[in-house]
Amino acid sequence: MHVIKFSSEDCGTCHRMSHYDAKVAEELGCTFVSVMLQDTEAYRKYRKILLKQYPNKEGMGWPTYLLVTDPDGDFTIHAELKGGMQQGAFRTKLADLLPS
């Protein structure tokens, strides 16, 4: 499972969560991908995934995490987490979304 984080350079909550989100995702056996909306190359690569979930970007949280299989191919979005949260809550919510 890939955890793709969509965030923005000017989002303070996104920056605070960057201190632990990748580590937590990897500890839970996921591949973590961070996509800053200002990073043109990364955004172009994962844009189709974001727009499938949020066609006009309304309702996104900052940050938004999408749990995806086959992100480079015929991807499937399995779940999402959005908005800021502490490390323990992030770990619990992410673990609850992963298949057993």
Regions found by a protein language model. Name each.
Residues 18, 29, 47-48, 90-96:
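Surface-exposed beta-strand edges and their flanking turn/coil or helix-capping segments
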Residues 60-100:
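Non-catalytic, surface beta->alpha helical segment in thiol-disulfide oxidoreductase systems
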Residues 12, 26, 38, 68-71, ...:
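A generic structural signal for solvent-exposed, polar alpha-helical segments
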Residues 12-23, 40-45, 49-60, 86:
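Chalcogenol-based redox active-site neighborhoods
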Residues 1-30:
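Local sequence-structure signature of Cys/Sec-based thiol-disulfide redox active-site neighborhoods
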Residues 6-7, 28-48:
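Thiol-based oxidoreductase modules, predominantly thioredoxin-like and allied folds used
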